[in-house]
């Protein structure tokens, strides 16, 4: 695809703006098929004579009707006339005096590269005008669709009019032979009573208006080619439509027959020319001899595409109340492959392993009476669990028990093995089918490591086979064990398991029972005489029951609900807002909290917890009725008390942190391993403090005391001498420990 020349796109807005013709939405234009020559009418400011100095010959042209369908409301009939003109022929414009001056119609501003198509009211003797069309590709752009009576403008690009600027200066003598020239004539209908229009005109700066038309005498041997473009009804939401007609010209100058037309490189079939007018859809039609090559409608309104999404296959939910029965010999292999070794009708032996959450089942044959079976395990493992005396296993977790039927049999034997007692208890039930109970986990995780268990406790194969077949099934939850109930493996009343739940004691976490993990929002009350049914009980005032409080003879609990309800009713009768929060936000614009009713303190100065404002750590407001209040911002007493309160709170926090740190250190000391008694092979110093060393040290201390007594030392001096002697003895012990590696120490006092 080649790009449309930029000069065509740059000319479109000017041509559209220069026409000055608006579109009417309700115009109903009919298609007019022209099969005979039709006279043409020209609009001229003055009468101009047309004379041609050169003889021109018109070649026969064959045309054929073509019907094109599009989405516009207007219908356009295009008549194409093909002629071949020599590029060297120069035609001088001259107007015969027989033309009549027409009445002035709607004035139209026309640029130098536009062609006007006008209606013809009567026949006139018009010859070929001064426009010589080059055979290198013409582009006639229909810039508007007007009403009946208004001129139709077809614009030619400026590059297509090289000879229009120099027309009336040169004249050549001799016969001028006109090869077939391709001239596109557009006939456009307005309303139903409009007359068809034929003609293409080019405007030059040196002439007013020159129309090229066909006369009956000239076009007797020509056939007009009619292109009928049928339109669909206009939609009410569509805006003005500008139609662009792009006519293709042959690339070379060869004679063109009536049936063949080549598209020149500047004009691409189906190429949509850009349009500068926003919001106006454009209709581009490329017309050639073979018909409409491309027709494209561009509109700014885009409809979102709806993409149909194919529904995904939802997973099938198969809820089965009864277990499936897999019949031997008729197993369908549509989803799973089942390998079942069956020499004879096997029975199922149930195995209970203490401490295991999986239920194991052993397959044994009915004919084998001996308990010596061949152990099968593909992965040798030494992690075995010896069986103890059989007892009901209490399941704390919630494993999934998968029931898979293997084959139907007349009787099902469930055996609970007891290694201590060789005899096993056999329970015969009346179930019509066997069930293999296994957890719904992948196969490598559920293979039991029971290699070294006694006979009768492993998965035994059928005679003649070396493997045990597992039924590969999807993990459907058939039976799920809950903590609230325990289902016994045996299905008969002969073997009954204890239905119980091993409950773990709720251990307090950080000294708080889990049910009471929610921290208390306020401190406990200390009521003694009010029965906790007065508003000065914090628990009662906040609508809560007393819990772990220090109150005595408390009625604020569920046991005394009647008295509690009576007290609540009495408080509400006195004050309907008694149980509402006393500390709330201030008025509009006040961000500080304040008491909703105000305090009534008289002797405390509002600096004790009796004052509700001070207790809430807010200052008294103007609604308080207190006397001698010191709970205001600039009060020195309040600042001192607040500082003391803050200091006390900080002290409590520090004590709590110290207790927590001390407890953590003690726990670390308890859990810290005991240090080794030997260091590097030598003895530690305290190992030298034996009974003999202690006796010698005491003798040394007594000797120092006697010496101080003889010298008459004071009591303080005597104690000092004794302590110095004790220190010397300890240093001797330590030094002896340091020399223990080299030579044995000798204690000297």
UniProtKB/Swiss-Prot annotation:
Disulfide pattern: none
Entry binding sites for Zn(2+) 6: 606, 620, 626, 629
Stored InterPro entries: CRC, Lin-54_fam, Tesmin/TSO1-like_CXC
Any Pfam family hit: TCR
Source taxon at top rank: Eukaryota
Site (Critical for interaction with target DNA): 536, 610
Record's GO cellular component terms: nucleoplasm; nucleus; RNA polymerase II transcription repressor complex
GO molecular function annotation: metal ion binding; minor groove of adenine-thymine-rich DNA binding; transcription regulatory region nucleic acid binding
Positions annotated to bind Zn(2+) 1: 525, 527, 532, 537
Protein name per UniProt: Protein lin-54 homolog
Protein's organism: Homo sapiens (Human)
């Amino acid at each position: 695809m080649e790009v449309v020349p930029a000069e065509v796109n740059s000319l479109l807005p000017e041509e559209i703006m220069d026409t000055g013709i608006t579109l009417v939405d309700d115009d109903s234009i009919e298609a007019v098929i022209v099969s005979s020559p039709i006279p043409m009418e020209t609009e001229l400011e003055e009468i101009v004579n047309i004379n041609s100095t050169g003889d021109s010959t018109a070649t026969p042209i064959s045309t054929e009707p073509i019907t094109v369908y599009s989405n516009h409301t207007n219908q356009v009939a295009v008549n194409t006339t093909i002629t071949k003109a020599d590029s060297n022929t120069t035609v001088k414009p001259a107007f015969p005096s027989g033309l009549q001056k027409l009445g002035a119609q709607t004035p139209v501003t026309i640029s130098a590269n536009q062609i006007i198509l006008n209606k013809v009211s009567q026949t006139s003797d018009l010859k070929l005008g001064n426009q010589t069309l080059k055979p290198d590709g013409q582009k006639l752009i229909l810039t508007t669709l007007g009403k009946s009576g208004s001129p139709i403008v077809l614009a030619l690009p400026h590059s297509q009019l090289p000879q229009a600027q120099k027309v009336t200066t040169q004249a050549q003598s001799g016969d001028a032979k006109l090869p077939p020239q391709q001239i596109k004539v557009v006939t456009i209908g307005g309303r139903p009573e409009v007359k068809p229009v034929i003609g293409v005109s080019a405007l030059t700066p040196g002439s007013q208006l020159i129309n090229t038309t066909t006369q009956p005498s000239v076009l007797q041997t020509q056939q007009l080619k009619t292109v009928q473009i049928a339109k669909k009804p206009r939609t009410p939401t569509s805006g003005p439509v500008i139609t662009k007609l792009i006519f293709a010209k042959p690339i070379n100058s060869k004679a063109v027959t009536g049936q063949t037309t080549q598209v020149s490189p500047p004009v691409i079939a189906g190429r949509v020319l850009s349009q500068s007018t926003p919001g106006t859809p454009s209709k581009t039609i490329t017309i050639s001899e073979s018909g409409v090559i491309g027709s494209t409608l561009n509109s700014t309104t885009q409809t979102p595409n709806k993409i149909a999404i194919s529904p995904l296959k939802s997973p099938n939910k198969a809820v089965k109340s009864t277990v499936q029965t897999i019949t031997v010999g008729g197993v369908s292999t549509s989803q799973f492959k089942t390998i079942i070794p069956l020499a004879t009708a096997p029975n199922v032996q149930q195995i209970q392993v203490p401490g295991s959450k999986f239920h194991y089942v052993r397959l044994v044959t009915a004919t084998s009476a001996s308990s010596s079976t061949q152990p099968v395990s593909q992965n040798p493992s030494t992690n075995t669990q010896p069986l103890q005396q059989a007892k009901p296993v209490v399941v704390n977790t919630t494993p999934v028990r998968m029931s898979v039927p293997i084959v139907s049999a007349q009787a099902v034997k469930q055996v609970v093995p007891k290694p201590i007692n060789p005899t096993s208890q056999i329970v015969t039930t009346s179930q019509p089918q066997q069930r293999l109970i296994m957890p719904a986990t992948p196969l490598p995780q559920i293979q039991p490591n029971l290699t070294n268990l006694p006979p009768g406790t492993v998965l035994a194969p059928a005679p003649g086979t070396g493997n045990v077949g597992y039924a590969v099934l999807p993990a459907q939850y058939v039976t799920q064990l809950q903590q609230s109930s325990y289902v016994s493996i045996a299905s008969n009343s002969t073997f009954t398991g204890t239905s119980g739940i091993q409950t773990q004691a709720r251990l307090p976490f950080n000294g708080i029972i889990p049910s009471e993990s929610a921290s208390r929002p306020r401190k406990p009350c200390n009521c003694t005489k009010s029965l906790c049914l007065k508003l000065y009980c914090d628990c009662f005032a906040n609508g809560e029951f007393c819990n772990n409080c220090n109150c005595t003879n408390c009625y604020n609990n569920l046991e005394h609900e009647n008295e509690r309800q009576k007290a609540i009713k009495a408080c509400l009768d006195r004050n309907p807002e008694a149980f509402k929060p006393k500390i709330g936000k201030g008025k509009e614009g006040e961000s500080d909290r304040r008491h909703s009713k105000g305090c009534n303190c008289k002797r405390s100065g509002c600096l004790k917890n009796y004052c509700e404002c001070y207790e809430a750590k807010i200052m008294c407001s103007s609604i308080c009725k207190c006397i001698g209040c010191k709970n205001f911002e600039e009060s020195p007493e309040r600042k001192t008390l607040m500082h003391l309160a803050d200091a006390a709170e900080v002290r409590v926090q520090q004590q709590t942190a110290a207790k927590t740190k001390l407890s953590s250190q003690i726990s670390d000391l308890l859990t810290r391993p005991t240090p080794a008694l030997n260091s590097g092979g030598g003895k530690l110093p305290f190992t030298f403090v034996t009974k003999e060393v202690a006796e010698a040290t005491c003798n040394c201390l007594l000797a120092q005391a006697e010496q101080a007594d003889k010298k008459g030392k004071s009591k303080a001096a005597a104690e000092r001498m004794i302590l110095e002697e004790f220190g010397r003895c300890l240093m001797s012990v330590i030094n002896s420990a340091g020399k223990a590696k080299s030579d044995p120490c000798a204690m000297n006092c």
